[in-house]
Curated annotation (Swiss-Prot):
Keywords: Cytoplasm, Molybdenum cofactor biosynthesis. It comes from Anaeromyxobacter dehalogenans (strain 2CP-C). The lineage of its organism: Bacteria, Pseudomonadati, Myxococcota, Myxococcia, Myxococcales. This is Sulfur carrier protein FdhD. The active site is at C122. Required for formate dehydrogenase (FDH) activity. Acts as a sulfur carrier protein that transfers sulfur from IscS to the molybdenum cofactor prior to its insertion into FDH. Mo-bis(molybdopterin guanine dinucleotide) binds at F268, V269, R270, G271, E272, R273. InterPro entries: Cytidine_deaminase-like, FdhD. One of its GO terms (molecular function) is sulfurtransferase activity. It is found in: Cytoplasm. SUPFAM superfamilies: Cytidine deaminase-like.
Amino acid sequence: METSLKRAAAPAGAVAERTVLRNGGAVRDALAVEEPLEIRVDGERLATTMRTPGADGDLALGFLFAEGIIAGVEDVGTVIHCGRPGEEGYGNVMDVRSAAGMRIDPERVLEGRRFIPVSAACGVCGRLSIDHLMERLRPLPAGEPVPTALVAAGMETLARSQPVFERTGGLHAAVLVGRDGAPVASAEDVGRHNAVDKVVGAALRAGRVGPRAAAASAPALLAVSGRAGFEIVQKAAAAGVPVVASVSAPSSLAVDLARAAGVTLCGFVRGERMNVYANGERLGLTGP
């Protein structure tokens, strides 16, 4: 099984330095950059997220795809930063333009959605959120089995795909891995959900995700740092990724969604040792 052993390089603009006190003295410390990114569709503002600069176009594409606003890259003509280099705020606004003969219509897609705050004390709201998502996400088919060795290889690739974290200790990471263990895309960000949007967007551009993607080239695994929450499983299900693995625990709502969406959910992955919270049969296991 092929794995990526080469460490990734940090993207430009992802690290800043500040003077801090350490052991009674002043030193320069590397920090992860956090800045707002406004996502527009055909010039109209849709959303703003706090992110680490880098792969902004992929972030925008992945976000729109996960929300069902675009069906694939065929809907998109251009993805560009607004403004001019040197202007205040340049690089923090991304405009996604419809392809010729197409019209991306967020209002039509989002109309009638139940935007219900979900919290640990709101089990009913959580259930409604899952039911609503499953109205537009079909459960993933069982498909080909995925060996636990692939999960272990994916987590190894994840560990080697965090150059900014190595310098700052302040970022999350995500990586998509194919069935052969080779990385499809990797990204870091201050927001775990942003990192996932970035790798999904990159896979969309590469033709590895989306309605026209060949099953043989589609990613088999999404590996993430930290915990696997509801949003992470949602994005994996939307992208058709059958296995999600994290170094930490999932949330209860993430487990519920994974079981409904046919996503295999693994947590506390240490080599080939892990907890499997949903659809373990895909890994050749019996249980949840």
